[in-house]
């Protein structure tokens, strides 16, 4: 089904978010050089992951709307992933399944949409301009196409600045989950002008 030109999905707001505690380290002290071998090794370790999944809390805040939801992100192979957003009652508000050249999205009424661009699809259907193509790397603690970034004292990403298509995103990492190897982001915040996206990961399962 072709995409409509209007906002279709409005996610139910959550009054409160309950997060599962995990072992988190926060950035401390001066950052390390992006040219360091430790950073190159960390990137390689993350890229070597074939499958991973994480769940947690999602918030989108702008002058136009405020959305709070739970999310589940599962990567099953290269360029194959699944994203769920659920409301306070646990019902699915949005399910997105992506593979090379084909993206399918099902809304909370069971309506199915198809496209070849997940980022564009979510933006049109929800009114939230989420940089999904870049977020797939950022959520792993990788800079993606960004070249302007900083590391913390543990040779992990602490901040990213990235401009594309008129958007100027700044990504700040608030800590890492050290229960996984390699350590994975535990919370992060994306900002562009008056809009903010917050993600808090309860846990990671990596393979």
From Swiss-Prot:
Quaternary context: Monomer.
HAMAP family xrefs: LolB
Annotated signal peptide: 1-21
Role summary: Plays a critical role in the incorporation of lipoproteins in the outer membrane after they are released by the LolA protein.
Keywords, ordered alphabetically: Cell outer membrane, Chaperone, Lipoprotein, Membrane, Palmitate, Protein transport, Signal, Transport
Lipid attachment in record (S-diacylglycerol cysteine): 22
Keyword Lipid metabolism belongs to the record: no
GO cellular component: a single term: cell outer membrane
Name listed for the protein in its UniProt record: Outer-membrane lipoprotein LolB
Family matches, as InterPro entries: LolA/LolB/LppX, OM_lipoprot_LolB
Record's subcellular location: Cell outer membrane
Entry keyword Signal: yes
Its membrane topology: Lipid-anchor
Similarity field: Belongs to the LolB family.
Residue numbers with lipid attached (N-palmitoyl cysteine): 22
Biological process according to GO: lipoprotein localization to outer membrane; protein transport
